Amino acid sequence: VKKRHAHRGMSAADAAALQGAPELIVENLEDGKIFEPRDTEVDTLTTPGESWEKRAATGKQLREHAPRSAHGGWRPDPGRPDPVTLVLASNKGRVAELIPLRMKRMAASPFAFLRGAAVVMAWDLSRTPVSGLDVVIDGDCHVDNFGLFGTPAEQVVLDLNDFDETTIGPWEYDLKRLTASVDLAGRDNGLSAKERRKAVKDVVAGYRWSLDRLHSLPVLELWNRHTVPERMDHRQKKLDKKSAAIIRKSVEKARASNNAALLQSAAMRNDDGQWRIKLDPPITTAISGHLKRDIIAGLHDYIETLAPERQFMIRRYHVVDVVRRVVGVGSVGLRAYLILLIGNGDEDGLFLQMKEAGPAALAPYLPVLPKAYKHDGQRVVYGQRLLQAAGDPLLGWCTMDGRPYYVRQMKNFKGAIPTEWLSGAPFNFFAFGYGALLARAHARVGDAAVISGYCGGSETLDEAVADWAEAYGDQTEQDHESFANDPDVKALIAELKT
């Protein structure tokens, strides 16, 4: 991937300002292809790069063509498509009988609409100003896509946990989607406009603060950093008692969310004493024997994408049941399956999720990814491995019936910080923390010094993005109202009652 200055129409002079910043390229390697920042003009293994001070100065120069104040405010582009039409078009290719459920979940609130309408925001973001620095982005960075999960050492950590929309694009896209979600979650929780603005500014402040701490770190130290929620404490945003209580309760719940607990709650023994996953239509439904065989065949391909030692481990399990299981809001209608495997004795259960990976919502508005990443399951896996500080060792991908999938553990101490619990100090604490976590993800795959230099030490960017998030929150409320009252959407939702 050649250096992309994502501010559409950047001049040659502006582009020249980035000469000291490393390119974002994808290097094709036989044993695991990775995204990495480097300068393709030189051999980086033998040539030293620019100092972080010089790279930070380069970032500051970018303000000349993309002032930080330019990120403020929101006005719909005159050519903006009808958001309802975009959402309905995104139903194409999904499981038909699940589309009404998707529509119902999206109609629940403006925040739910934002979650499910990534295609709408992708179009909107593509018309916003950007600095010109691309990184591997999450692509769907909202408050409910941060969560708890376990490391291989069974330590519960907090990080980004959904990567279906990951791609290469402007770092601002992740930051703006996160701030819009904070604004809308605040509305759901009854926060005033002043309180929402404070929380959004905390997101950006956390992002800037984290970049400032990370941009001079040794590379290995940066990549080894992960966040233990009980130890979340920031210089500007101390851990208050209410936030500590929320963390404690959430972590306790996550620790109880493991394969052993799921085996007892989500499965039962049949008349022959064999484990079977409980059915709960339309969320969990039975599938045909033919489809089960296809899924098992896909698992064989998936295993080949794991590290060799993990391949050895997972082959000690055998499949005993497979069902279709609906997940999420925007993902409803994509094919997703829950697979129960049994290992060392019939109490040793392992639950895997095989989920269809569709094209990233931002894909139409960004340069095409290299051929090696045309497989959307592979794209999701590599994005997660790069952005997540401590990943799932059983994360892999496969193809089934011509469709790309990725596979991951269903329950490995997974949990959430429920957004509905947050108000006052906890809302601001987690807003700051999520901004900081996003910055760390971007620092792993981009040039933190250049981005930090652009963002700066003042609140200029914070104020601008706060203006944007509030205005975009208003826009999303309007879009949600149009969606919830649309006759076609209402007709689809009504099918759930018949």
Where are these regions (language model features)?
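Acidic, low-complexity intrinsically disordered tails
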Residues: 8-43, 498
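Intrinsically disordered, low-complexity regulatory segments in nuclear proteins
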Residues: 16-21, 74-81
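Conserved ATP-binding subdomain of kinase catalytic cores across diverse folds
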Residues: 50, 55-68, 78-99, 104-138, ...
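Intrinsically disordered, low-complexity Ser/Thr/Pro/Gly-rich regulatory segments
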Residues: 36, 69-70
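Short Lys/Arg-rich cationic patches that frequently serve as NLS/NoLS or arginine-rich RNA/DNA-binding motifs
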Residues: 1-11, 54-55, 60-63
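Charged, compositionally biased N-terminal leader segments and the immediate start
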Residues: 40-52
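Long, low-complexity segments enriched in small/aliphatic residues
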Residues: 227-297
